[in-house]
Amino acid sequence: MLSKFLIGLSFNGKVVKGKGIGKSIGWPTANLEIDGRKFLPGEGVYASWTTIENSNKKIESVMNLGSQPTINPLLPSAVEVHLINKDIDLYGLNLSVEPVEKLRSQIKFKNINQLSNQIKKDKDNALKIFKNYKK
């Protein structure tokens, strides 16, 4: 169910180079540079719609907002977006991200394989959510 706190919330950011960890485990992400003064939802993993600049098409996505506790808990919070079933070079482009529903809170996994397995579950759960919403 779309949280009343997320209705109408969206934010924009420029895709910047990350460390490539998501891509190396099969889940490429667009790392967004966000104005720190923007209002963002709480940390966690969200089903989201992402729109690429100069496009009106909303793409199903999964967004991680916050730290990367499994990779390196000392890294600053970040916004990363995985476009579901899309492989697009987004570096330097601006994206608009619209959170739809929170899937889960941040979790520190024992290893990268556990993280990758959970991301697959997140994607599957997001796809179930998108079936209930119009873009």
How would you label these PLM feature ranges?
Residues 1:
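Contiguous mid-protein beta-loop-alpha structural module that forms a pocket-lining wall or clamp
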Residues 4-135:
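Phosphate/ribose-recognition catalytic cores of enzymes acting on nucleotide-derived substrates
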